[in-house]
């Protein structure tokens, strides 16, 4: 074993996939501290990958259940933007292929902006179909945010290039004939819903950053329309824009 350099061992560990591989035992018996460090790093990496695979299996349980009932095109649907004082509510519907594996995909609120962007690209690459639904602030004011959220979800489903035969929806029942399941906190329990939430979140964040170029004083690129101190101070100084939800407190007080 000592005939192998540390670099040789590092390169070979890249090819080892099983902790029971005899090479791992050989490395563990190697007296060199640098080799011991490599083994520890490899074992940690394997444990992390195992945990992510187990998470993926758990988060595909609703999809497997639907497929066992004969459904094939299963769309996960979620929306973002219920709480902000400005900007649209955005929904996305995503149909993932049965064989895909996007490890680490989970509730978008638990992911960093960088990670969401990475998963956005992966989902767009892997998905069979992605649909987007957008409902602007003026409509939110007319029909309320709950109804606007449902409308955005329906629009997202209608925007899909393939027609789903089953829907997994985050905490909502939609006025559609399509078979569906409403799942509380679905973006943490279903990969399809998590994918929809990620696409919706990144899409909306990009929209708000673009709006910031037209309305730089409100800090939309940072607050995404939420009622931060900076945003409220801008509302007090400049009043609401066409992007603001006039029926939302405290926007009403600045009209």
From Swiss-Prot:
One GO term (biological process): DNA replication, removal of RNA primer
Keyword entries, A-Z: Cytoplasm, Endonuclease, Hydrolase, Manganese, Metal-binding, Nuclease
Domain of life: Bacteria
Cofactor-binding details, from the entry: Manganese or magnesium. Binds 1 divalent metal ion per monomer in the absence of substrate. May bind a second metal ion after substrate binding.
Residue intervals of the RNase H type-2 domain: 72-255
Disulfide partners: none
Its EC number(s): 3.1.26.4
Catalytic activity: Endonucleolytic cleavage to 5'-phosphomonoester
Record SUPFAM superfamilies: Ribonuclease H-like
CDD domains referenced in this protein's UniProt entry, alphabetically: RNase_HII_bacteria_HII_like
Annotated compartments: Cytoplasm
GO function term, MF aspect, one: RNA binding
Cofactor field: Mn(2+); Mg(2+)
Name assigned to this protein: Ribonuclease HII
Native source species: Bacillus subtilis (strain 168)
Name of the coding gene: rnhB
